[in-house]
């Protein structure tokens, strides 16, 4: 497999291969279309319509109608296409340092966005036509050094690679940037918008902390701990009702977090004293970057305090040191009554309410390089999680919405072979 993705409402699955592409219904799982295009490295669907966007060569995108077997349009770009995003209003094409935004009704180019280098194509476009937001890493301007470059040297990009995890929220309808969310200290590794375009989930390169923010105002609503040690996040996915968030990584555990509980409200950060902030910023940081404070474990929440609140008095620091050996939930609850919400969060990290363990060895295929990658989605019709792995496996797990805990494998499929797991 070269590429795999779910459509916007998770009712279909598209797979790109060296021999073409295939489209499947997810419930019940069945193949509904096969395309014989050679070497499809990207494929994206528009909901359950017959419109698909495919990439076969590095700089070329073809939009075609699978039902009629016709090409709607072809687009060629100045550099390699890294990703495609679309909804019923907009069509976005990501290059390493640019995003091209089109009106999907007539495929007219609306806007070109310059970005920092984004080789991992970190970007999300909401499925909603009303809350039509595009999210991507905030470009970091290049600082002027005064050094003169040779006349024959190619021009430098105005931006450099991000060193922190800030997300720019761009209104793809009005074509204006509307907010910046300071989500993590370390650079981003994965972001996702919910179906309604009202929630943003983020993960940094460290992968221990997952955060959820409101869109477009950028208020931090939830903070979850995926694990203690660093991990590469492959996929973030909300369910259709935005009550669950599913996270896959390079570990064999998939985490499901519940969004329906109390929010971890954060006070709004003060505006910049010089008044130059173009957008309101929601500040929240974690220990993704740098060494953890003394006395904390790997991935500790100790540094997960807004910058404005991070300075503590000697008395408070002494209290932390004296109590670190015996601090439990009950003590944290008592002390929490006297401390700001931002500080008490570090004692009560929200854990997953359900999880999934992927089968060891997957479908038996040997991995060509690196860990088994996975893409996840939550069914829109039942409490089930769908997982697609890079070795060609498609798994369906049932989740107990009351008790949580470990999900139960219900079905699994692979290529021409399919089976139903024992009850």
Swiss-Prot record:
<keyword id="KW-0926">Vacuole</keyword>
<dbReference type="GO" id="GO:0044804">
    <property type="term" value="P:nucleophagy"/>
</dbReference>
<dbReference type="GO" id="GO:0034045">
    <property type="term" value="C:phagophore assembly site membrane"/>
</dbReference>
<keyword id="KW-0653">Protein transport</keyword>
<dbReference type="GO" id="GO:0032266">
    <property type="term" value="F:phosphatidylinositol-3-phosphate binding"/>
</dbReference>
<feature type="repeat" description="WD 4">
    <location>
        <begin position="367"/>
        <end position="407"/>
    </location>
</feature>
<feature type="short sequence motif" description="L/FRRG motif">
    <location>
        <begin position="224"/>
        <end position="228"/>
    </location>
</feature>
<feature type="repeat" description="WD 2">
    <location>
        <begin position="183"/>
        <end position="223"/>
    </location>
</feature>
<dbReference type="GO" id="GO:0034497">
    <property type="term" value="P:protein localization to phagophore assembly site"/>
</dbReference>
<dbReference type="GO" id="GO:0000329">
    <property type="term" value="C:fungal-type vacuole membrane"/>
</dbReference>
<keyword id="KW-0072">Autophagy</keyword>
<keyword id="KW-0813">Transport</keyword>
<keyword id="KW-0853">WD repeat</keyword>
<keyword id="KW-0472">Membrane</keyword>
<dbReference type="GO" id="GO:0030674">
    <property type="term" value="F:protein-macromolecule adaptor activity"/>
</dbReference>
<dbReference type="GO" id="GO:0000422">
    <property type="term" value="P:autophagy of mitochondrion"/>
</dbReference>
<feature type="repeat" description="WD 1">
    <location>
        <begin position="1"/>
        <end position="34"/>
    </location>
</feature>
<comment type="subunit">
    <text>Component of the PI(3,5)P2 regulatory complex.</text>
</comment>
<keyword id="KW-0967">Endosome</keyword>
<dbReference type="GO" id="GO:0061723">
    <property type="term" value="P:glycophagy"/>
</dbReference>
<dbReference type="GO" id="GO:0005829">
    <property type="term" value="C:cytosol"/>
</dbReference>
<protein>
    <recommendedName>
        <fullName>Autophagy-related protein 18</fullName>
    </recommendedName>
</protein>
<dbReference type="InterPro" id="IPR015943">
    <property type="entry name" value="WD40/YVTN_repeat-like_dom_sf"/>
</dbReference>
<keyword id="KW-0677">Repeat</keyword>
<feature type="repeat" description="WD 3">
    <location>
        <begin position="228"/>
        <end position="267"/>
    </location>
</feature>
<feature type="region of interest" description="Disordered">
    <location>
        <begin position="260"/>
        <end position="320"/>
    </location>
</feature>
<dbReference type="GO" id="GO:0015031">
    <property type="term" value="P:protein transport"/>
</dbReference>
<dbReference type="Pfam" id="PF21032">
    <property type="entry name" value="PROPPIN"/>
</dbReference>
<dbReference type="GO" id="GO:0000425">
    <property type="term" value="P:pexophagy"/>
</dbReference>
<dbReference type="InterPro" id="IPR036322">
    <property type="entry name" value="WD40_repeat_dom_sf"/>
</dbReference>
<dbReference type="GO" id="GO:0080025">
    <property type="term" value="F:phosphatidylinositol-3,5-bisphosphate binding"/>
</dbReference>
<dbReference type="InterPro" id="IPR001680">
    <property type="entry name" value="WD40_rpt"/>
</dbReference>
<dbReference type="GO" id="GO:0010008">
    <property type="term" value="C:endosome membrane"/>
</dbReference>
<comment type="similarity">
    <text>Belongs to the WD repeat PROPPIN family.</text>
</comment>
<dbReference type="InterPro" id="IPR048720">
    <property type="entry name" value="PROPPIN"/>
</dbReference>
<comment type="function">
    <text>The PI(3,5)P2 regulatory complex regulates both the synthesis and turnover of phosphatidylinositol 3,5-bisphosphate (PtdIns(3,5)P2). Necessary for proper vacuole morphology. Plays an important role in osmotically-induced vacuole fragmentation. Required for cytoplasm to vacuole transport (Cvt) vesicle formation, pexophagy and starvation-induced autophagy. Involved in correct atg9 trafficking to the pre-autophagosomal structure. Might also be involved in premeiotic DNA replication.</text>
</comment>
């Amino acid at each position: 497999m070269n590429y795999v993705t779910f459509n916007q409402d998770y009712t279909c699955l598209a797979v790109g291969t060296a021999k073409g592409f295939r489209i499947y219904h997810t419930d019940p799982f069945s193949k509904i279309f096969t395309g014989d295009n050679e070497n499809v490295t990207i494929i994206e669907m528009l909901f359950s319509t017959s419109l698909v966007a495919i990439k076969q060569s590095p700089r070329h995108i073809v939009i075609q109608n699978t039902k009629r077997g016709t090409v709607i349009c072809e687009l060629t770009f100045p550099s390699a296409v890294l990703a495609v995003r679309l909804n019923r209003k907009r069509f976005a094409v990501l290059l390493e340092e640019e995003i091209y935004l089109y009106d999907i009704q007539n495929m007219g180019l609306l806007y070109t966005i310059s970005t920092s280098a984004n080789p991992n194509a970190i970007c999300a476009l909401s499925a909603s036509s009303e809350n039509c937001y595009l999210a991507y890493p905030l470009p970091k301007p290049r600082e002027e050094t005064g050094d003169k470059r040779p006349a024959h040297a190619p021009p430098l990009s105005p931006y450099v690679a991000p060193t922190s995890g800030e997300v720019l929220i761009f209104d793809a309808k009005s074509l204006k940037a509307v907010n910046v969310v300071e989500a993590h200290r370390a650079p981003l590794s994965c972001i996702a918008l919910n179906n309604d375009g009202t929630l943003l989930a983020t993960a940094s390169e460290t992968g221990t902390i997952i955060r959820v923010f409101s869109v477009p105002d950028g208020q931090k609503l939830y903070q979850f701990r995926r694990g203690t040690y660093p991990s590469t996040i492959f996929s973030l996915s909300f369910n259709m009702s935005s009550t669950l968030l599913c996270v896959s990584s390079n570990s064999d555990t998939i985490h499901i977090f519940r969004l329906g509980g109390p929010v971890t409200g954060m006070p709004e950060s003060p505006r910049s004293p010089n008044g130059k902030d173009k957008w309101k910023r929601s500040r929240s940081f974690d220990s993704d970057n740098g060494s953890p404070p003394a006395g904390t474990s790997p991935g500790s929440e100790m540094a997960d305090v807004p910058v404005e609140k991070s300075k503590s008095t000697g008395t408070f620091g002494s209290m932390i040191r004296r109590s670190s050996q015996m601090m439990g939930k009950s003590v944290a609850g008592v002390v929490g009554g006297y401390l700001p919400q931002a500080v008490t969060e570090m004692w009560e990290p929200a854990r997953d309410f359900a999880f999934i363990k992927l089968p060891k060895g997957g479908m038996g295929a040997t991995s060509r390089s690196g860990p088994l990658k996975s893409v996840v989605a939550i069914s829109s019709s039942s409490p089930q999680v769908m997982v697609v792995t890079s070795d060609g496996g498609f798994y369906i797990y049932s989740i107990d919405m009351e008790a949580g805990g470990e999900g139960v494998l219900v079905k699994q499929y692979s290529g021409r072979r399919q089976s139903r797991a024992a009850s």
